[in-house]
Each structure stands twice: as C-alpha cells, then as structure tokens.
C-alpha cells in the first residue's frame, strides 16, 4: 500500500513538472522574440532598407522646390543640373549615376535645363552647366573642380563625411559619342572637323566664338603697339639725309641735258632710216636691171 502511494506521488510530481515546463516555454519564447524584434528595429533604423542603389530621379523645377522644402533631418540630397545638348553634361551624367550607386544613403536628383525656369537655376546659384549641388538642412555646397569620378568622390566624402558602400570602375570611352566632348582626343583619333561639327555643333561654335573674342581683344592692343613702333621708328629717321639725296638727284638731272640726248637719238634714228632707204633703192634698181637683161636675152 505504501509503495503504491509513493509511486502515485512520484507520478504526480512528474506530471506537475511537465505541465509547468510546458507552460513556461511560451513565455520564454515570447521574451526572446521581443528582444529579436527590438534588435531588428534598431538595425533597420541604423541601416535602412533604402540603401539599395537607386538611379537618380529626373525632376522639374517645381518638384525640386517641393523636395527641398520637405527635406527634414540630416538627410543629404545631391542635385545635378545639366543640359542634354551639352557634351560636358553628357560626360558627367554617367558619373553621377555611379555616385548614386556608391552613395545610396544620399538622394540623387537630376534637373534638365529645359525642365526648369531660369529663376530656379538662379535661386540655387547655378550659372554654368553641368553643376552638382549638395544640400541638407545645414549645408548648401556647390561643387567647383574637375568632373572626374575620383574628384567627385572626394567632394562627397568631404561634404557629407560618408564613405562609399562600393566602388564602381569607370568605363573606358569608346567611339565619338563617348569621347567626353574632348576635342583634342577627337583630333588625335583623326576625326575631321566636319564630323565634329555634325556631332557637336555647339562645341565648334563655342570655339569660334572664343577665337573671335580673342581677336577682338588682341587687335586693339596690337594696333596701338604697331602705331607706337612706327612713330618711334619714323622719329629716329634722319629726314635731312633724304633732303640731301633729293638735291643731289636734281643736280644730276640738271647736269645731264635730257633734251640734247633726245635730239641726238632722234638724229641717229633719222640717219639710219635714210641710209636704209638708199640701200633699198639701190637694191631695187639692181634687181630691175637684172630682170631687163634676162628679158632681152629671151627675145633674141
């Protein structure tokens, strides 16, 4: 009897332990799940899922103003102002796309010249294209420098203090379209001026405009220098020598009687003419006598 009671008591204790263990396990699981959720939320706050590379967003002037006004916090925004017809803008645009992949934590916007009013460009201090503007609540920095990828990365790092999440290699330019608007490179490749004018007429016209401006600036300076040089040269000449030379020339003319020489020449010519006439008459008479003698001999 006592043994049966003891066995039942042991079974009851085992069942109670099993039920208590099974009841406490969901509590422990819920506690672990709550801690994991806190860790996940903290991780997403520090590394948001929007870090995946996104291409720059094309916006117009009104959309840019709205995005600038709605910007809050320390979030950075990089804006590219460009013109589709400009070869330098076409060279910077792929680099700007690379920057959006290397710095996904920065929002990248692109504003084309024809999609915004001139007041928008003047409001943000844009006076040349292409231009890159880095903006947040306390920063409004416009990039001044070379447009190569390494210089742009250094500008991003200095302006924001952020490091690129990845490095993208810049592709080699191929063909005339990828020549980055470099006229020297095109000429080295043997590209004719006519082909360059067909591909980028604005580049050729801008070079002609620069040459005309240089000519307009240089010509007055060169003209004044030439006048000063001519004045100094004429002032140093001894005009008295020219007077002496002219006097000697006049004296020589007076010493030589030109009229007498002309008369002598005319007399010589007339004498030669008369002598030739006499010779011609003698020659004609001799021919006539010879012809008469021949006719008389024939008649006999």
Swiss-Prot record:
| Glycan-bearing residues | 136
Keyword tags: Glycoprotein, Membrane, Signal, Transmembrane, Transmembrane helix
Q: Does the keyword Amino-acid biosynthesis apply?
A: no
Bilayer topology annotation: Single-pass membrane protein
Q: In which compartments does the protein localize?
A: Membrane
Query: InterPro entries under this entry?
Result: APRL5/7 (IPR044794), Thioredoxin-like_sf (IPR036249), Thioredoxin_domain (IPR013766)
Primary location class: membrane
| Positions of the Thioredoxin domain | 41-161
Q: Which stretches are transmembrane?
A: 202-222
Cleaved signal peptide residues: 1-23
Domain of life, per UniProt, equals Eukaryota
- Descriptive protein name: 5'-adenylylsulfate reductase-like 5
Name the gene behind this protein.
APRL5
């Amino acid at each position: 009897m006592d043994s049966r009671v003891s066995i039942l008591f042991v079974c009851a204790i085992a069942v109670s332990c099993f039920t208590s263990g099974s009841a406490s396990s969901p509590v422990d699981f819920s506690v672990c799940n709550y801690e994991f959720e806190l860790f996940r939320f903290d991780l997403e706050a520090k590394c948001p899922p929007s870090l995946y590379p996104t291409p720059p967003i094309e916006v117009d002037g009104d959309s840019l103003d709205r995005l600038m006004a709605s910007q809050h916090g320390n979030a950075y925004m990089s804006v590219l102002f460009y013109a589709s017809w400009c070869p330098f803008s076409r060279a910077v645009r792929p680099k700007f796309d690379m920057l959006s992949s290397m710095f996904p934590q920065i929002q990248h916007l692109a504003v084309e010249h024809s999609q915004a009013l001139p007041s928008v460009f003047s409001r943000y201090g844009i006076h040349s294209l292409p231009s890159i503007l880095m903006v947040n609540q306390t920063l409004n920095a416009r990039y001044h420098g070379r447009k190569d990828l390494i210089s742009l990365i250094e500008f991003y790092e200095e302006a924001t203090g952020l490091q690129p999440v990845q490095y993208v290699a810049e592709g080699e330019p191929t063909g005339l379209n990828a020549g980055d608007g470099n006229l020297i490179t095109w000429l080295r490749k043997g590209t004719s001026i006519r082909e360059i004018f067909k591909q980028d007429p604005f580049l050729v016209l801008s070079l002609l405009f620069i040459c005309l401006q240089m000519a307009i600036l240089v010509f007055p300076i060169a003209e004044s220098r030439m006048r000063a040089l001519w004045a100094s040269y004429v002032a140093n000449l001894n005009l008295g020598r020219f007077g002496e030379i002219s006097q000697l020339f006049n004296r020589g003319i007076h010493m030589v009687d030109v009229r007498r020489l002309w008369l002598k020449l005319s007399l010589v010519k007339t004498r030669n003419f008369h002598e030739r006439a006499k010779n011609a008459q003698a020659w004609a008479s001799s021919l006539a006598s010879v012809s008469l003698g021949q006719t008389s001999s024939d008649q006999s």
